[in-house]
From Swiss-Prot:
GO terms for biological process: signal peptide processing. The keyword RNA-binding does not apply. This is Uncharacterized rhomboid protein P4H10.10, mitochondrial. It comes from Schizosaccharomyces pombe (strain 972 / ATCC 24843). InterPro entries: Peptidase_S54_rhomboid_dom (IPR022764), Rhomboid-like_sf (IPR035952), Rhomboid_protease_S54 (IPR050925). The chain crosses the membrane at residues 115-135, 150-172, 185-205, 208-225, 277-297, 299-319, 321-341, 350-370. It comes from the Eukaryota. Coiled coil: none annotated. PANTHER family: PRESENILIN-ASSOCIATED RHOMBOID-LIKE PROTEIN, MITOCHONDRIAL (PTHR43731:SF14), RHOMBOID PROTEASE (PTHR43731). The active site is at 292 (nucleophile), 351.
Amino acid sequence: MCISSSSLLCGINSLKYASNRVGILIPPFQTASSLNIFRPYVIFSRSHRSLSSVDVSSPSLPLREHLPLKNVYSQVPLLPVWSPIPKGPRRFLLPPKFHYRLSPPPGEFKSSPRVAIMVAVIVCLVNGVVFWHWDLARDEAIRLHDFKRFRFMMTHAQASLFNLYEGRWWTLVVSIFSHQNLAHLLVNCVAIYSFLSIVVYKFGVWKALSVYLGAGVFGNYVALQRMMNEENPFATLPNGPTKVWDLLFPKGPYPPISRPALYLGSNPEYGPIIRTATFVPQSWATGLLGASGAVYATAAIFACLFPYTEFFLFFVYPVKAGIFMPLDFIAEYVLCLLNYEKKFHVAFDAHVSGTFFGVVSSLFLLPAMWKRRSLYCVGIVKKRIWSNKAKA
């Protein structure tokens, strides 16, 4: 039912609608007098930069977009209509920078900036405390030849196949907060402060931490599965474990294997405390350390939310999130296929798994945004097809 402009009597309260187009959706009305139940409220401009305090009953507003459902008076039903094809010609398939349809709707942040920063700082502090214990354990092992603390960290703070074999499943989580050296710790902490704070600000503390820890565990699982495929001492047994899942949930008692000696990989810095393990494959004694899978997941969610946002890589190179993350995913996936993990001592498969986990998580966290993007892209493609047919 259409409403003529002459029946709308209420005016605009300090409208700032000069260059930024603002759109709302007017619900269906029975009579023109029903407009009196509306109240003025603040809406965001399409550029996300300015605010406009307007009256919803103003006849000057285009009836095109919609605001979040919670901002409209609860007694009035909404008619969720969306036009996927924008007005005006387009030269490129991708929309311009900071386009409204590729960004999440404003005003839907689940946390405050102070809480988001506090959560990121707490995660960084936990990483620092765990790294301090690792450094203290290495120092005691090298200088004092006291391996008690070092053996405890190797047993409970790193993810390895042998730890899972002995039932220490929590190492999949604790290893996310462990790091190899100071450079590894600093790089991950900078990334955590940059990306995790934004994810917490957008989705809230519990959802953000669930994605963070879930991506870290998933990355460790994929990397350990790759190690298990390389060397498996139980491969010849009829009921032996063939997957990491079998170690987490054993079907029955497996044959005992000898305990590995102190082992920290092939880093020459810790040569004096490295020992070879008897009857235990190297891949089973090698542990995984680091929060790279979780960090890549938060970076992937950030790229999905704000693909045209630029950030400085290593504080030097400005890159766009929507361009850098796909290129990095392809590069690390190629390195996984070429088996460069042992050469660089980097779990590239954990990075790839974390990125994949972040993208899939964004599909569940913001389904409306992905639906809007798909409709928008389909509309552009159809419009191009129709224009080409018209020219032909």
